[in-house]
């Protein structure tokens, strides 16, 4: 770390922290007091947002795949993000950023997503038909696959490059915007950007936490007969929060890294159990068919606007999902940046887009196809239960059908708790880093700051449950905030392209691959003009050396 980094003052942006908390709790109070009005307003917002921005959102997600893979396969994909060896093993690294990008509600959707597509299918298929059932898991693969993770990768790479290569200070969204545009991170624009990010993180995590708490308490009630009450949900949330707070307080290496291993290995082993002791042949066959259907119809699924129809499926599912992933992207980018020092751009892109997609395809393929099989053979009418009683009831019934069903339900609940704690840890880190100014490479927010945000992130969902504020309204608000993030990610991407051209356009591919440029020695901490001059001198020297040895 250079002397400039060491002398940089690190402090908490109290104005940003207080303002964001005021906005969050006022919003919760408003949702509780004006619940009916907020539901109507939210429905109008959602309808307008998904209708007007259908084509831009679809194109954004589709082009994100093209750009990220193009970057990975180009010479720029060989650029190393920071000096030295990677801080974490490849497995730990992948586990951690996967958990930063998906919440514990993934376990909920893993059993039920297909049922929604069966009832309201895409590609103009008849509802609840054989064709709709055939494409149901394929659409689930599509919405959790390449496009989604490419959005995460697109947001992450520019921040990684700014922080680890350009050595720009501050691990926040506003910091990279400052590096690209010149707008100060502590100015009006910078604080507005970070405020939107914080509100979005609170909203997204609250939705995931409340949904998990509802699912957990319902299954717990089926197992033990404990009443599914407000206090039961609060106890569950507090238990998760204690685990989350301990993990966050002890730091990334002792906390998040261990939790991520526990969760990912636990989920994989649970899925293997379902695969082996469930309808193995059906799960394998339908997973393969669903993957092929997704692959062969990928462009149609990506750009299906349904201009001759009402476009309802595209608006309510594909556009909704892409906006949901976009709303999470800045937070994921902050966390990925923190754990990716020493990796190359290509490694980050492939690990996120391929690793994240394959991981979710495996989990969704096993859980959803077990659910589909149970529906086809009349064991559990998942679509009907989903519509009439709620998804958490359907999950409980599905788990109870497994061999050693009650034991599997307990294990599922345990995985869900640790999953949620790990995800909250990642979000808590991103939030505390955003409110901590002056962070340089290798520095983290203080343990006390992380602990404070643990408490705040816990209070909001409890307040939502207690006040009976409509969760769908907060979901809509979170989705709507994704629109500005599209612009912000595009600005970040513009900055990334500009930096890559300035820094490496004239550098041969083999020199990048050999890591012939020591980032500190060539002056990446200097001005851009000085940096460009040093790069030219280094390039000229390497050419002379090649001539002498040839």
Residue ranges and their predicted role:
Residues 7-32, 65-67, 102-106, 143-214, ...:
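Helix-loop-helix module between adjacent transmembrane segments
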Residues 2-10, 34-49, 68-87, 136-143, ...:
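Membrane-water interface regions at transmembrane-helix termini and the short interhelical loops
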Residues 9-27, 182-191, 228-245, 249, ...:
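Loop-to-transmembrane helix boundary motifs in multi-pass membrane proteins
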Residues 109-123, 161-163, 167, 274-297, ...:
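Extracellular/periplasmic helix-exit of transmembrane alpha-helices
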Residues 50-53, 60, 193-201, 207, ...:
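Membrane-interface loop-to-helix entry segments
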Residues 2-8, 40-46, 73-91, 115-138, ...:
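Flexible loop linkers connecting adjacent transmembrane helices
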Residues 165-169, 197-217, 330-352, 406-435:
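Membrane-helix boundary/coupling elements in multi-pass transport proteins
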Residues 1-132, 272, 276, 493-500, ...:
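N-terminal alpha-helical transmembrane segments of multi-pass membrane transport
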């Amino acid at each position: 770390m250079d002397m400039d980094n060491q002398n940089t003052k690190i402090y908490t942006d109290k104005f940003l922290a207080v303002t964001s908390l005021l906005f969050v709790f006022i919003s919760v109070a408003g949702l509780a007091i004006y619940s009916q009005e907020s539901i109507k307003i939210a429905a109008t917002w959602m309808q307008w947002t998904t209708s007007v921005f259908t084509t831009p959102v679809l194109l954004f997600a589709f082009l994100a795949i093209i750009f990220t893979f193009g970057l990975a396969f180009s010479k720029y994909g060989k650029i190393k993000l920071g000096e030295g060896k990677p801080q974490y093993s490849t497995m730990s690294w992948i586990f951690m950023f996967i958990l930063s990008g998906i919440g514990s509600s993934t376990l909920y959707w893993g059993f039920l997503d297909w049922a929604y597509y069966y009832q309201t299918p895409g590609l103009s298929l008849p509802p609840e038909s054989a064709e709709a059932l055939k494409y149901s898991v394929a659409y689930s693969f599509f919405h959790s696959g390449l496009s989604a993770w490419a959005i995460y990768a697109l947001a992450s790479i520019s921040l990684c490059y700014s922080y680890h290569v350009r050595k720009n200070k501050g691990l926040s969204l506003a910091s990279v915007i400052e590096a690209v545009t010149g707008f100060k991170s502590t100015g009006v624009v910078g604080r507005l950007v970070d405020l939107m990010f914080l509100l979005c993180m609170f909203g997204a995590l609250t939705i995931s936490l409340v949904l998990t708490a509802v699912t957990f308490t319902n299954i717990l009630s089926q197992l033990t007969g404990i009443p599914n009450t407000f206090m039961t949900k609060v106890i569950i949330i507090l238990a998760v929060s204690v685990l989350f707070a301990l993990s966050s307080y002890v730091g990334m290496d002792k906390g998040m890294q261990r939790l991520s291993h526990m969760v990912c290995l636990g989920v994989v082993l649970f899925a293997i159990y379902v695969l082996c002791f469930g309808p193995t042949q059906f799960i394998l066959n339908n997973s393969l068919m669903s993957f092929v259907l997704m692959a062969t119809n990928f462009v149609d699924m990506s750009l299906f606007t349904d201009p001759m129809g009402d476009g309802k499926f595209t608006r309510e599912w594909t556009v909704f999902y892409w906006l949901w992933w976009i709303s999470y992207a800045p937070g994921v980018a902050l966390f990925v940046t923190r754990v990716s020092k020493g990796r190359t751009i290509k490694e980050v892109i492939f690990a996120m887009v391929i690793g994240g997609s394959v991981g979710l395809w495996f989990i969704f393929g096993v859980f959803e196809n077990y659910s589909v099989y149970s529906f086809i053979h009349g064991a559990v009418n998942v679509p009907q239960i989903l519509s009439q009683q709620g998804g958490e009831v359907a999950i409980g019934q599905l788990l109870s059908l497994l061999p050693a069903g009650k034991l599997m339900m307990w294990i599922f609940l345990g995985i869900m708790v640790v999953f949620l704690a790990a995800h909250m840890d990642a979000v808590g880190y991103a939030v505390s880093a955003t409110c901590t100014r002056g962070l340089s490479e290798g520095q983290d927010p203080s343990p006390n700051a992380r602990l404070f945000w643990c408490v705040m992130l816990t209070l909001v969902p409890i307040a939502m449950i207690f006040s009976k504020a409509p969760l769908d309204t907060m979901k809509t608000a979170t989705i709507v905030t994704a629109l500005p993030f599209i612009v912000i990610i595009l600005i970040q991407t513009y900055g990334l392209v500009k930096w890559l051209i300035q820094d490496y356009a004239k550098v041969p591919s083999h020199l990048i691959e050999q890591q012939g440029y020591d980032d500190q020695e060539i002056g990446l901490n200097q001005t851009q003009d000085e940096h460009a001059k040093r790069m030219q001198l280094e390039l000229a020297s390497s050419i002379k050396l090649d001539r002498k040895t040839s």
